[in-house]
Amino acid sequence: MPYQFGINIERELSRLLGVCRIIVPTAVVEEVEKLAQQDGEVGRAATLGLSIIKKRGFRLMECAHKGDDGVIEAALKVDGAIVTNDKELKQKAKELELSVIYLRGGNRLEMEEELL
């Protein structure tokens, strides 16, 4: 998301939440590593994403599940929000009463529901 739209995800999350900790589920890292093997825009964006995760020292969280289920698992473990634009993941998160942060207008993040 940051690469395609030129936003600073850390700054945007701080604007929305104040002081926060970014946790990246291993399910996400595995998915992004696969995407990084592709040629073109997708591969470059994924490679940059992996670089950001490493350089910023974001905390990684081991997940028993893969894909969307791993993201939900991590959010439930820490009572956190999910950052995504994926419609199916947003719907699953809403059903579980998890807060969802998404890209709005191509230049800012917005929260669908307040964290409880």
Where are the model-predicted features located?
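Active-site-adjacent beta-strand anchor residues
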Residues: 25, 82-83
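Acidic, metal-associated active-site segment
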Residues: 65-81, 87-96
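Acidic, PIN/NYN-like endoribonuclease modules and their adjacent C-terminal/linker elements
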Residues: 90-116
